[in-house]
Amino acid sequence: MDFYNPYLSKKPTDTKTPKLHTTRQSICRLVPKCFRNPTEKGVVSVSSFALPTYFFKGNENKVYLENGKSMWHLRRPCKNALLEEQSITFHIYDIVETTYSEDRCNDIPFKFQTDIIPNGTVLKLLGRTLEGASVCVNVFGQRNYFYVKVPEGGNITYLIKQALNEKFSPSCAYQTEAVKKKILSRYDPEEHDVFKVTVSSSLSVYKISDSLVSNGCEVFETNVDAIRRFVIDNDFSTFGWYTCKSACPRITNRDSHTDIEFDCGYYDLEFHADRTEWPPYNIMSFDIECIGEKGFPCAKNEGDLIIQISCVFWHAGALDTTRNMLLSLGTCSAVENTEVYEFPSEIDMLHGFFSLIRDFNVEIITGYNISNFDLPYLIDRATQIYNIKLSDYSRVKTGSIFQVHTPKDTGNGFMRSVSKIKISGIIAIDMYIVCKDKLSLSNYKLDTVANHCIGAKKEDVSYKDIMPLFMSGPEGRAKIGLYCVIDSVLVMKLLKFFMIHVEISEIAKLAKIPTRRVLTDGQQIRVFSCLLAAARAENYILPVSNDVNADGFQGATVINPIPGFYNNAVLVVDFASLYPSIIQAHNLCYSTLIPHHALHNYPHLKSSDYETFMLSSGPIHFVKKHIQASLLSRLLTVWLSKRKAIRQKLAECEDLDTKTILDKQQLAIKVTCNAVYGFTGVASGLLPCISIAETVTLQGRTMLEKSKIFIEAMTPDTLQEIVPHIVKHEPDAKFRVIYGDTDSLFVECVGYSVDTVVKFGDFLAAFTSEKLFNAPIKLESEKTFQCLLLLAKKRYIGILSNDKLLMKGVDLVRKTACKFVQNTSSKILNLILKDPEVKAAAQLLSTKDPDYAFREGLPDGFLKVIDILNESHKNLRTGQVPVEELTFSTELSRPISSYKTENLPHLTVYKKIITRHEEPPQVHDRIPYVFVGKTTSCISNMAEDPTYTVQNNIPIAVDLYFDKLIHGVANIIQCLFKDSSKTVSVLYNFVSTPVLFSYELLTDHSVKA
């Protein structure tokens, strides 16, 4: 396949352009030199007046048509709208808040013009009609508002006028109304005199409120936008079906890039909560391939081009049919099941891609790590290299945003920041973030995740092959193209596997926020919006938090584990929805809270009217339900009742699509319920109340301790009284709590068989709940272990009653371990958990002191473990272990000159490759290595390239690998000998190999397993 490249002529200095397709503004294009000479690297800069161009099936076409539309409008049906006012039914997936000013009056129907004088909020509802046409409905008349408590003698009108009269203040229409409201901050049943300040545009809210605060006023709900007012005040939703009874078609002065557009008032809308089906929303999975002139590509280097972009489309709810496209820089041979669009330069391809997002009716985009790489790279190339105005490529015109916000603070933990994709009218789902959140794997490469979830693999093309393939011509580019397309196909399959688009839409509906904010804006905004709605129903208003420097609190603690191997049944009981149930049972809320210093202000309250908790900061009180019902409790009760009803429907449902939606609905409720506690405990959150959060964790700790004492005191006779069937047991039967983890207790059941424990577990949990706790707090039997290796807090391995292996906090497939260590460690673990003789020996050892083995020797059963270690050493010594199983790999994360520490194994191998004049790895390549030769004081010097090792028959470092194995095994059986270092000593003492090597003797620990 070939085409005429208008930007490369015979003479490099000849920049003449064909007469057809010209524009007034010159465009600077970067064209790869290899298009002229396949062996030449780099780019040539060509200035041209030609409009962006593409080739499809050998025919040249313009990216943009004369009517301003793009090439993609030719490839979808045109939807015609009637000219007169009409009734329409449509589904929305996004709401965009914009502001119109009075100079836009001629663009809109006369009846809405007063809503934008001097300016006004316009909400753009984006979605699809019943017929499948994309639609934008511009909603007028929705006002934003907040509340103000004015100090005595203050004049609210004067203060607002003063704020608006200041220089650079935006013009704004406003209205004040005296109202009575309860304030949600502490127990206070009284209604207060406040002013409701309604403004025509949200642009003025902060300007006015800041001025009011500086004049001694107290403001409320200034952090609520017009979208949430629209949804909450009208009982609407951010995702679902609407009917507009009086929609005015907008034929001219269009303000969106949809098939059709209408104007209406918010009062013309009706929401259909009972309809859950989806229209055929267009989901696009994409991936980019780049080349770097000097290693890993950097978007701001002119020569580091994007060479291909794959786009895979799927209509939500359709069968597995997808449509594959490949945008290629330069000629490209055919790729199976893929439409190939060829572009003569990178800027042409970028115009093709961004116009595709805008004009191909794409509602959802997805990819793998697109928020950290693909989209930032695309945006930087477009804006920094070519000065493309990307705000022209979202789904709306006014208020358009097309950017990725990368926070400066990207730390870990609860408040960790993530890059946020912000494209107006586009829901962006980064499947890398989704997979990291939902899976627990040794790494989160697309290949690893796809293999784990859907049993699929990527095409085998390494990064270092991409440049040679690209330069080689159409066939090479087709190979890259297939690799690129398959990546997008895999991501689309992962999206379908998790059905994450349905999940986030259900969270958005429950939390009353736009769907595109679910993945990026955290849980604070979800709970805040729900609390806002609940507060409004009870005439409460919410204060604005400014307590950013408040101290934190002691989080959930555990009952320290008793490490060891347990060859008895271990019952795990846990509290169902622990934190939500504590809030419900103890009536905890802002509205029920009385600080200790304020208790004297409520002389009418008796001690029986409130519950007192002793926190680290002092006593705190919460009134009981008969005095004031907790708003948080009521919210949780409604949610949990709804979840119960949904799960009942789910059990009866047979339609797969409906089952998926119901499942995601109940999951959305579960996630949001569990977020309520965290919402109150974040000092820098939207409405923090550390006293509530600390009370919840205090109660959680107290409940664990109470349960421990109660269960351990339970005798076989007591158990028999509460169980309707005969409970068989040994004479010495007893219960011992060996670990408590936040909301779970691990109970060793001495003298009871596993089957017996499984049968009485529910009765024991229910009896404990009944005797100790108020409803709805409920202890449940979660699982039973046949045997358990309890290593430390949140680290254990066991065999469940159904014979399945369960591991928590223990990763046998470690990134820093080779397959030899992983496989042998797994073999030994399997022996300890399943071989009766080894199990008995392990149980004995875990009850003895660490030096028992040195005094008395190892039990006979445990010698099977030593036999495996001896056999492994023999295999290493005799060369029976394949080099592939001994290979490590580490990413070359940056140029070698940027490393401060050079004694790293992969850098040693890099230098050896350079010395041998072989092709060096590129930045972000993984460098494989093995350890060879005799042990030295600097382990990194022993690293060698695996291929070179095999070719030259270099002996591996037997003792180093065996030591890694010893440490790997010690890591998983350390509880038998009290700690890892003692376990290493015991193992070395009993293997038939002399102690020739140990990490403790060396100073270089850079590659420790």
Curated annotation (Swiss-Prot):
The gene is 9. It is found in: Host nucleus. GO terms for cellular component: host cell nucleus. Pfam families: DNA_pol_B, DNA_pol_B_exo1. One of its GO terms (biological process) is DNA-templated DNA replication. Belongs to the DNA polymerase type-B family. Its EC number is 2.7.7.7. One of its GO terms (molecular function) is nucleotide binding. Keywords: DNA replication, DNA-binding, DNA-directed DNA polymerase, Host nucleus, Nucleotidyltransferase, Transferase, Viral DNA replication. InterPro entries: DNA-dir_DNA_pol_B, DNA-dir_DNA_pol_B_CS, DNA-dir_DNA_pol_B_exonuc, DNA-dir_DNA_pol_B_multi_dom, DNA/RNA_pol_sf, DNA_pol_B_thumb, DNA_pol_palm_dom_sf, DNA_pol_type-B. It is an enzyme of class 2 (transferase). This is DNA polymerase catalytic subunit.
